[in-house]
């Protein structure tokens, strides 16, 4: 029997993200028709100074696979977060920003706000020049929005979703 691995001290502030999240979202962009999707996100850890991240979406209407991405989330310094992502479409993202805990009378909210510092792409990938992500976690509800600049369009809203701890 394998004992659970203790959480690395550098990711304690990110610990509320750990687990499986399921929910629904919507997407839009000037170059594609609006769409709805279901989603599952898993944040895990192996005792190192990062969390693992795996995301999968399916079309809400017929369940066909849509998008997936995988990567790592790190907090190299207090209130700082780095998110490194790879997409099977040939895109990679390095995002950096802030990690804050907002305390209210109704409980704590964990907020992550990151912007891309680098976007890489393979020769066959569509052009994506910038990405921003905002994640808020309050209790067992995780909400996010994604902004994207792609195919000559400026940075603008692309995705939003509400997920609940499974």
Curated annotation (Swiss-Prot):
Q: Does the keyword Isomerase apply?
A: yes
Membrane-spanning residues:
none
Where is coiled-coil annotated?
Answer: none
* Family annotation (InterPro entries): Calycin (IPR012674), Nb(III)_bact/plant (IPR022939), Nitrobindin (IPR045165), PeroxynitIsom (IPR054873), THAP4-like_heme-bd (IPR014878)
Pathway it works in = Nitrogen metabolism
Tell me which CDD domains the record gives. lipocalin_heme-bd-THAP4-like
Q: How is the cofactor bound?
A: Binds 1 heme b group per subunit, that coordinates a highly solvent-exposed Fe(III) atom.
Which residues participate in heme b binding?
158
Enumerate the UniProt keywords alphabetically: Heme, Iron, Isomerase, Metal-binding
Q: Which reaction does it catalyse?
A: peroxynitrite = nitrate
Enzyme Commission number(s) of this protein: 5.99.-.-
Extract the GO molecular function terms from the UniProt entry.
heme binding; metal ion binding; peroxynitrite isomerase activity
**Short motif (GXWXGXG): ranges:** 19-25
Which Gene3D superfamilies does the UniProt entry name for this protein?
2.40.128.20
Recorded hits in NCBIfam families, A to Z, give:
PeroxynitIsom
Provide the function of this protein: Heme-binding protein able to scavenge peroxynitrite and to protect free L-tyrosine against peroxynitrite-mediated nitration, by acting as a peroxynitrite isomerase that converts peroxynitrite to nitrate. Therefore, this protein likely plays a role in peroxynitrite sensing and in the detoxification of reactive nitrogen and oxygen species (RNS and ROS, respectively). Is able to bind nitric oxide (NO) in vitro, but may act as a sensor of peroxynitrite levels in vivo.
Q: How does it assemble?
A: Homodimer.
- Give the matching PANTHER family: PEROXYNITRITE ISOMERASE THAP4 (PTHR15854:SF4), THAP4 PROTEIN (PTHR15854)
| UniProt record similarity statement | Belongs to the nitrobindin family.
* Protein name stated in the entry: Peroxynitrite isomerase 1
Species annotation = Mycolicibacterium gilvum (strain PYR-GCK)
